[in-house]
Amino acid sequence: SPSRGLGDVYKRQEWHRQRGDELVLISASGEHLVAPMAQMLGMDHCVAILLDEEAGMLTGQTRGTLSFREGKVVRINQLFAGKEHLWQGSFGYSDSHNDLPMLQAVSHPHAVNPAPALRQCAEELGWPLWIWQLHP
């Protein structure tokens, strides 16, 4: 089962599903790693770093905007071009201060199991701080 070992993550995903939200897994890792995880989790969309391939081999070159820091906001805007209204009421979850631009762009930012730098920012901005259990 995709939910096995994900505990609170799965519960929150189900909450979003019941609301009819579109679920996006966005990562600064390569799409070849993130896409299978997004599929396993039943995400509607996957946004990750695009890597060039030649003859089925990764070249080490990237293409497009990297989904890192401000690039995550750019890539989400590209994904939902013409549907900018989807930002209204949107939720974002992260553990890293590198995701501050994305968290500042959503309506409901959440710092989840945050690293110290994000914890400090979230406390200063009054964002919810959540500690999720990764095991049921």
What does each of the following model-derived ranges do?
Residues 1-10:
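Single conserved hydrophobic/aromatic residue that forms the stacking wall/gate
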Residues 6, 20, 43, 106-107:
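Short, well-ordered alpha-helix to beta-strand connector turns
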Residues 12-41, 45-50:
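Substrate-recognition element of Asp-dependent hydrolases with the DxDx(T/V) motif
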Residues 23-28, 91-131:
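Acidic, Mg2+-coordinating phosphoryl-transfer loop and its flanking beta/alpha structural elements
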Residues 34-64, 93, 103:
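Cytosolic catalytic headpieces and adjacent flexible linkers of membrane translocases
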Residues 48-54, 114-118, 134-136:
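Short, acidic/turn-prone active-site loops that include or flank metal/cofactor-
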Residues 63-77, 132-136:
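A polyampholytic, Gly/Pro-enriched intrinsically disordered region
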Residues 71-98:
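Conserved Lys-Pro-Asp/Glu-containing loop-to-beta segment of HAD-superfamily phosphomonoesterases
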